[in-house]
């Protein structure tokens, strides 16, 4: 059993070294083992010239569950689009494939991005990965894939009972719809539903409205709010 534990920790260190090889010289060490939202992880930290890196590598599958690279970001040199591209490339490298940026905002020199898994044009919001990018250097400074690892699965997608056109008729007439998408969204207690997403404006505010694709009932509505912490959905 002891040899098996050593093999697991060695593999976690190997994965850490490969992922963060471009972050500067450092000597990573396993600082413990923890349950992170039902995912057993090895905690690994390393002090580099650019700052400290802390990461959690899953015991099963060797996936990067989360990490923080404590690097200060100063002057903004990269656009939102460049940050999205760099984050997408990084996720691909980690094995998180078919991911689409569904939300982003900049704050304090850092671009905060949410990526969701997509399949046949359908956005799977439960399968979410959060990524932070330094807008000065393009370095990925943070990641949280907890939701993705807990929820990602092969889904049996049944054909919707209603069309997106029918769902549009259920949207408040005062909402000026700018975009529409098909998505799977969480509805509580581990349940999901297929919905049509409508993004629009009303009285200078942006709203996200979700209409159930099978019942045509409004299941969620969010308003975009600007706060000191950044742009949030509430």
What does each of the following model-derived ranges do?
Residues 1-234:
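Long, terminal "pre-/pro-" and other extracytoplasmic accessory regions
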